[in-house]
Structure formats: C-alpha cells, structure tokens
Amino acid sequence: MTSNRGRPPGEVLVDTSALYALLCSTDDCHAAARDAAEALLAHDSALVTSSYVVAETAALLQSRLGRDAARGFLLDLVPYLDVAWVDEGLHARGLEAWLAQRREGVSLVDCVSFALGHELRLEHAFTFDRRFVEQGFVVIP
C-alpha cells in the first residue's frame, strides 16, 4: 500500500476517542475532530472500525451525555461506518496483545483495533490516542 501523506487516505481506522470528540461539542478535541471528519468525508475515505469500538463509544456516550446521544450515534452515524464485526480470531489476537501489555491504559478494545488495522493493512487512524502512533499508524488529525 502506498503512503497517502498530505491528503486524506482511502481507508482509515476510527477510534472511540475520535468518535466521542466528534459527537461531544464540549470536548477539547471537538473542533479538530469535526474538521478531520469533514476532510475525510469530502474525500470519500472509508471509515473502518470494529464492533467493539461501536459498543465502547455507545457506552461512553450514554454514561457521559445520556441515552439520546448514544441512540443518535447508533442510528445516525454508525450506518456510515464500515464496521468489522469482531470474530473469535480477531478477539483472540487482540486479547493476546492486551495480555502482553505491561502498562496501564491500553484497553482490550485498543488491542483489537490495532490487530484489525494491521490485518487490513490500514496506515491511518482517526484518533486522539497517541498509542496508535506507537503501533505504526499515521494519526489523523
């Protein structure tokens, strides 16, 4: 896969941190998330995520912003995402990576996302979590 540095990529892995920032107008990263999402959509970038990220984002929205925010996400935004449903194999690869982690802060959902992104050979991740850089992704924004 060739590098797309300098322009939005064709496919990008999407993380909970980006989705939450996009949907929460009071989040410190909201403006950056909105601008990045607009650029990605303007270039018809495929927004790829896992079913675990969908569940994590819905739970986070519900706990912080209420059920209506989670409902809006699930009904209005998720249909525009390319959701990879986590199967037993992807879960096992993510779990193995998570168990190998020695530090706090890296979640099972993160490790499943890393595994999914590597499996699909995605170079870019729409995220505010810098651990994606450590995993070899070019982060957006």
Where are these regions (language model features)?
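Short, well-structured N-terminal submotif of metal-dependent ribonuclease cores
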Residues: 1-48, 62-72
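Acidic, PIN/NYN-like endoribonuclease modules and their adjacent C-terminal/linker elements
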Residues: 1-9, 54, 114, 119-141
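Histidine- and aromatic-rich ligand-binding microenvironments
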Residues: 9-15, 49-50, 106-107, 129, ...
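Short active-site oxyanion
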Residues: 42-47, 80-82, 121-123
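Active-site neighborhoods of divalent-metal-dependent phosphate/nucleic-acid chemistry enzymes
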Residues: 83-124
